[in-house]
């Protein structure tokens, strides 16, 4: 924040929703935590809603540790934004295109944002491309203005034909191979495999939704910030790639994953965690 905060002034932050004392080992959306959405209302009372342009949120926090929203949380955020005429923007760079078994997290949670940011899965990350989807009301507001202009927000490589071709081909594969449904069908298999690791050495929490999961470690033995990278290294040496960040692992298998591959992932994690003392 010291380095980047001054570059983006006028931004307030909601508290994240993870609380291991109240929601550890939740499968899917935690039961506890809906009240945390009302922190947005408190911020708006302090700042005056008329000064707030938009609320930007990841429906599921991805690289920050797979923080799954409590039941009703996103619905409440939508309700507050609508009440105060504030735009709701979903960052679906990670959750979009099948990761949660649906085209978008907005579909999974039945919450309609005003804008969706997307990338990664748009081209299967084979070539850089991102996009923003707008609600028609925003588009129409611009195009029917007294002096209409285009929805101008372009860069040097906007609409790059190679990236667009990759995106179209990727969308075809999603449809032809029914990958969103495969992710949906594999979710309970993935969930069971991950939560079978509960009770292992220094495991503080396991959480999951769709084909996203995280294992959080405590420092009851060696420091968690040393434990997580050692688990990563052990898995890597056994040809299973997970991601570590400080004191947790993120597991996010590809949309084509099958039960035998999920079993291999959980076996590698079990062996790695059990080997460290």
Model feature map: region roles:
Residues 1-277:
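Conserved N-terminal phosphate-binding loop of PLP-dependent enzymes in the Aspartate aminotransferase
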């Amino acid at each position: 924040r010291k380095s980047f905060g001054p570059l983006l002034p006028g931004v307030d932050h909601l508290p994240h929703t993870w609380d291991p004392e109240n929601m550890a080992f939740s499968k899917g959306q935690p039961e506890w935590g809906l009240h945390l959405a009302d922190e947005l209302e408190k911020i708006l009372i302090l700042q005056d809603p008329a000064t707030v342009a938009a609320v930007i949120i990841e429906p599921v926090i991805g690289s920050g540790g797979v923080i799954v929203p409590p039941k009703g949380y996103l619905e409440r955020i939508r309700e507050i934004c609508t009440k105060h005429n504030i735009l709701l923007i979903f960052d679906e760079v990670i959750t979009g295109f099948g990761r949660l078994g649906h085209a978008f997290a907005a579909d999974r949670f039945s919450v309609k944002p005003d804008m969706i940011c997307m990338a990664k899965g748009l081209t299967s990350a084979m070539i850089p491309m991102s996009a923003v989807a707008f609600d028609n009301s925003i588009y129409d507001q611009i195009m029917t203005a007294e002096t209409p202009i285009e929805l101008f927000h372009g860069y040097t490589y906007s609409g790059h034909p190679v990236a667009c071709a990759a995106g179209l081909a990727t969308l075809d594969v999603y449809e032809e191979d029914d990958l969103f449904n495969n992710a949906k069908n594999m979710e309970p298999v993935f969930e069971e495999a991950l939560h079978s690791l509960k009770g292992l050495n220094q495991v503080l929490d396991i959480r999951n939704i769709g084909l996203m999961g995280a294992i959080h470690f405590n420092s009851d033995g060696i420091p968690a910030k040393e434990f997580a990278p050692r688990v990563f290294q052990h898995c890597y040496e056994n040809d299973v790639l997970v991601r570590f960040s400080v004191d947790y692992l993120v597991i996010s298998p590809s949309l084509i994953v099958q039960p035998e591959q999920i079993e291999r992932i959980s076996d590698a994690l079990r062996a790695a965690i059990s080997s460290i003392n």
